[in-house]
Amino acid sequence: MQGRILAVALLLASPLYAFDRQDFDRIADFSVTIKTLAGLSEAGGLSGRLLLLDGTVASMQFLDAAEASFAVELELAGGEWIGTEDVKIYLCRVRFRGQEYFRRFPRRAPRAPGPSEILLNDRILVVARLAGRAVAEDGSPLWVLEGLHVRALR
């Protein structure tokens, strides 16, 4: 009986060996950063692809605080030094929707945050896809992404 189960498992897993790097690169792009996003005027080849971004949670706006329809929008910031005195900041927004994120983004910062909780000023890693454009407070264009997975880098 165990031999049959193993044989079925191997048959079901065999299509996974057919995937190669080119197949993966068609659905994901891990080379994109917040800086490269800020420089894009159009989605181009990134439309529909998964992006892996890291940055700091600069702001958190709760669009819907009810658990059943929870929605939060993060402003994700990255930056770089220009010389020794200037810093250039790059921003994008990431929206997370669904009750699975309700406990990940507490409205009030706990004294001892759990490992899965995301707080303001946390450095995070996000898997997301482009959802559109918005305008920042200073009038500059800003990419908005649909967040799929998030993890704190502590």
Where do the protein language model's features map onto the residues?
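OB-fold and OB-like single-stranded nucleic-acid-recognition modules
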Residues: 17-154
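Hydrophobic h-region of N-terminal signal peptides that target proteins for export
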Residues: 9-18
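Sec-dependent signal peptide recognition
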Residues: 2-8
